[in-house]
Amino acid sequence: MAGEVYLLWLLPLLQGLASYGAELSSEACRELGFSSNLLCSSCELLGQFSLNQLDLPCRQCCQEEAQLENRKLYPGAILEVCGUKLGRFPQVQAFVRSDKPKLFRGLQIKYVRGSDPVLKLLDDNGNIAEELSILKWNTDSVEEFLSEKLERI
């Protein structure tokens, strides 16, 4: 019952945002409960769960698979983690504490109190271009992703 009330409250908000017709910012998508690495193919599954009303905002927050395959190199990245929570993410911990971060030009490890593991890719001006949660990534996935997105030393 509470979920239905929440959904009824959320729908007008989503419809209002959808009226703008453009992609939503990563912050707006996160506030709506969408992951920063949401694939558009996931939006196609909403109908199976009678969630068609979420289709439009989902499509405004998703990334096309082909778009993900672009080989754009970023000049830098920040991997944010909380030192006290790092033990809960052993794969990320293994990457951070190894010599692997030194292999990537422009990669900074930043310890932010309370932060779950997040990877922020920076544009030429040092602004955040993409932000990805890496909670469930293993060491090889982090290294492979950074190999595709950053220049190796």
Curated annotation (Swiss-Prot):
Subcellular location: Endoplasmic reticulum lumen
Keywords, in A-Z order: Endoplasmic reticulum, Selenocysteine, Signal
Domain of life according to the entry: Eukaryota
Endoplasmic reticulum recorded as keyword: yes
Tissue expression from the record: Higher levels in polster, prechordal plate, axis, otic vesicle and somites. Lower levels in fin buds.
Segments forming a coiled coil: none
UniProt xrefs under Pfam families: Sep15_SelM (PF08806)
Molecular function in Gene Ontology: oxidoreductase activity; selenium binding
Keyword Endoplasmic reticulum: yes
Record SUPFAM superfamilies: Thioredoxin-like (SSF52833)
Family note: Belongs to the selenoprotein M/F family.
Reported function: May be involved in redox reactions associated with the formation of disulfide bonds. May contribute to the quality control of protein folding in the endoplasmic reticulum.
Designated name of the protein: Selenoprotein F
Organism of derivation: Danio rerio (Zebrafish)
